[in-house]
């Protein structure tokens, strides 16, 4: 549309207005000429005067941007409202802009000479001052749009297109910067100069929007490539036919698809295809052949997968570097994986070093790996017996249903006729387990020479078995002459008692005791409720004696001699030593509480009684006061007479059958345990 309509700043908003009059005003600065405009606000018919610096050219993009911001604000307001004057003014301006756009599209054919004439703008000299930073974005946009427009307008021949594209690509930055500064100055200072530019604006915006959308999609693809480390295929970078015809000719598109297919084929898995070095060389050869057939400029623009016309050749170099970097990373990962395998298996790592040092020594392969098979008869395992450390043993037999095995320890006088030990399979460890070295070091603390001899014997057996010089079980190997060079190292007199022993001379006496103790210990015994019941009954007696002080009068009468006591008479006539004292209370806390109370009662004793007992406080409290207090409390709590209460006290706590059996078995076990060392001597 013509330049008589502008966007002016009024009431802190940009209002569309019609220019009525323009007047220039002199300024103090010689370089700047300010002008004031008399405008009329659309849909309001209100005339105002504004400065030219506060106005902008009325364009479709500016109006749509303002309306979109108002739409966002209206979404926040939930309540319905009427259309404001500002919104009506913007809608009117948008309709006027659209009508002007239709007119400009009809006159595009007449504007083509004007667009092509922009090529002849002279280049900016190299010593020209740099542009401002805020102008860089517009200059880049204008540069891309102008280059694509030049390419789309010249449809006569393929050769002319290529030459025109690259000449404009080389001289475009300086020309577009100059044009951008001129256009920017015109838009900000003088709206009247926008009459001619408005007609070109819609055409440029269409092309710029298409270019920007393609550029944004390609930038996202390039970032995705860097993150995922692969070259995208041609299908990922295709554009619809309508846009591709307006942007680039058909020949470069074909070349780009071919080059992208080549790069995609080169990015196959290195494990399935050729080696990494061949992969890179194969990619370079394919790329060079494409460049020789089509041309350096076209192949560069096509293989990069980008739809910009003037693209630097360093993009192809970066793709080659990306391939080489991926190959190096794959090699490093394979090296790390092999290093981890060697670190997890130290035996295999040591074997590989030995193979490199001495090629003549060829050990069997199966001794370098951990055993993964199940337990079998004749297998060598680790077994811990009683107080001894883990020791190499041989499985004599296995009971699969019970999951138990009979094992025999490896020792100097080993014989298959000896009786083994039956143990659970869970207590056994494979000989080549991961803890093998730790088990050997633990056994060396007390049996250094013996465990070294066992390890050498087992190693010799497995080497001969792997080389084929011997076939048979470990027991057969130990009894054969082939094992004599290893067996002769051990002298029976020297190593008689430094091997773990499964049995000794008292094996016949130990087995019945062990079985009986196991039978008693593994019985499922329910908790005994008789003792807690007795403790609760005794708690009532303690409360009666200590808290209620129900026996205090009876005890004070005995201390002062007013009451006769059978226990006092026996105390005075007794000998100096008393073998046993019946306490009746089984809980020590209850007994301590009663004794402390009786000691307080003892302080009230008279001098005559103190002389009779010879001032023996502890013995008098335990043998006289304690029985009298318990009997008196039983009589009062249970409702018995003194004789019946005394008989219950003398009988003691009533033990159950289970308590008696446990007590008797404990006494017998302690007695037999003490008798065994005496028989050994």
Curated annotation (Swiss-Prot):
Q: Which Gene3D superfamilies match?
A: 2.30.30.140, 6.10.300.20
Sequence segments annotated as region (Disordered): 102-144, 166-200, 285-304
Q: Which residues does this entry mark as bearing Phosphoserine?
A: 128
- Bias class Polar residues marks the residues at 102-121, 285-302
Which CDD domains does the entry link to?
A: PWWP_MUM1-like (cd06080)
**PWWP domain sequence ranges:** 377-438
Q: Which organism is it from?
A: Mus musculus (Mouse)
Tell me its family. Answer: Belongs to the PWWP3A family.
Annotated protein name in UniProt: PWWP domain-containing DNA repair factor 3B
InterPro entries tied to this protein: MUM1-like_PWWP, PWP3A_3B_4, PWP3A_3B_4_C, PWP3A_3B_4_N
Keywords, A to Z? Phosphoprotein
Q: Which domain of life is it from?
A: Eukaryota
Locate the coiled-coil region(s) and give their ranges: none
């Amino acid at each position: 549309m013509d330049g008589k309509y502008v966007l002016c700043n009024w009431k802190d908003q940009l209002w569309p207005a019609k220019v009525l009059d323009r007047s220039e005003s002199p300024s103090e600065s010689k370089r700047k000429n300010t002008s004031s405009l008399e405008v009329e606000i659309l849909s309001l018919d209100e005339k105002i005067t504004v400065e030219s610096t506060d106005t902008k050219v009325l364009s479709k993009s500016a109006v749509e941007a303002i309306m979109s911001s108002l739409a966002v604000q209206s979404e926040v307001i939930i309540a319905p409202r009427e259309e404001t004057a500002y919104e009506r003014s913007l809608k009117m301006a948008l309709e006027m802009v659209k009508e002007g756009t239709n007119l400009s599209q009809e006159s595009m054919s007449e504007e083509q000479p004007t667009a092509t004439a922009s090529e002849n703008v002279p280049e900016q000299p190299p010593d020209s001052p740099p542009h401002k930073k805020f102008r860089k974005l517009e200059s880049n946009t204008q540069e891309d749009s102008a280059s694509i427009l030049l390419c789309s307008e010249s449809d006569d021949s393929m050769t002319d297109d290529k030459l025109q594209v690259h000449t404009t690509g080389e001289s475009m930055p300086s020309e577009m910067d100059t044009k951008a500064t001129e256009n920017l100055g015109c838009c900000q200072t003088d709206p009247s100069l926008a009459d001619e530019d408005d007609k070109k604006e819609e055409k440029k915006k269409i092309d710029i929007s298409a270019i920007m959308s393609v550029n944004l999609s390609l930038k996202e693809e390039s970032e995705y490539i860097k993150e995922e480390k692969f070259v995208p295929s041609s299908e990922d970078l295709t554009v619809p036919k309508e846009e591709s015809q307006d942007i680039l000719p058909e020949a470069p598109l074909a070349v780009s698809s071919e080059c992208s297919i080549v790069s995609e084929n080169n990015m196959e898995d290195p494990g399935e295809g050729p080696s990494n070095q061949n992969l890179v060389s194969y990619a370079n050869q394919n790329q060079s052949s494409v460049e020789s057939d089509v041309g350096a400029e076209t192949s560069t623009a096509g293989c990069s997968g980008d739809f910009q016309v003037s693209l630097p050749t360093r993009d192809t170099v970066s793709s080659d570097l990306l391939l080489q970097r991926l190959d190096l990373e794959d090699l490093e990962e394979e090296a790390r994986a092999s290093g981890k395998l060697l670190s997890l298996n130290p035996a295999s790592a040591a074997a590989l070093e030995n193979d490199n040092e001495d090629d003549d020594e060829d050990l069997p392969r199966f001794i370098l790996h951990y055993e993964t098979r199940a337990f079998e008869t004749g297998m060598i395992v680790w077994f811990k017996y009683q107080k001894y450390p883990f020791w190499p043993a041989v499985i004599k037999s296995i009971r699969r249903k019970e999951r138990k095995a009979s094992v025999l320890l490896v020792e100097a006088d080993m014989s298959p006729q000896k009786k083994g030990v039956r143990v659970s399979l869970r207590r056994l460890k494979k000989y080549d387990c991961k803890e093998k070295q730790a088990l050997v070091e633990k056994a060396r603390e007390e049996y250094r020479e013996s465990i070294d001899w066992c390890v050498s014997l087992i190693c010799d057996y497995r080497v001969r078995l792997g080389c084929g010089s011997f076939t048979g079980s470990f027991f057969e190997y130990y009894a054969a002459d082939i094992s004599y060079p290893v067996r002769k190292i051990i002298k029976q007199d020297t190593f008689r008692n430094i091997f773990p022993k499964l049995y000794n001379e008292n094996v016949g006496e130990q087995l019945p005791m062990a079985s009986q103790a196991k039978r008693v210990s593994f019985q499922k015994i329910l908790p005994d409720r008789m003792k807690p019941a007795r403790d609760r009954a005794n708690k009532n007696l303690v409360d009666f004696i200590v808290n209620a002080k129900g026996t205090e009068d009876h005890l004070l009468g005995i201390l002062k001699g007013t009451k006769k006591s059978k226990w006092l008479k026996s105390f005075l006539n007794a000998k100096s030593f008393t073998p046993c004292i019946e306490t009746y209370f089984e809980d020590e806390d209850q007994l301590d509480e009663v004794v402390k109370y009786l000691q307080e009662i003892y302080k009230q004793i008279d001098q005559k009684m103190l002389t009779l007992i010879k001032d023996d406080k502890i013995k008098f409290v335990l043998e006289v006061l304690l029985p009298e207090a318990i009997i008196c409390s039983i009589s009062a709590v249970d409702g018995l007479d003194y004789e019946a209460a005394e008989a219950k006290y003398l009988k003691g706590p009533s033990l159950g059958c289970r308590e008696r059996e446990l007590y008797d078995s404990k006494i017998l076990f302690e007695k037999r345990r003490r008798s065994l060392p005496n028989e050994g001597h």
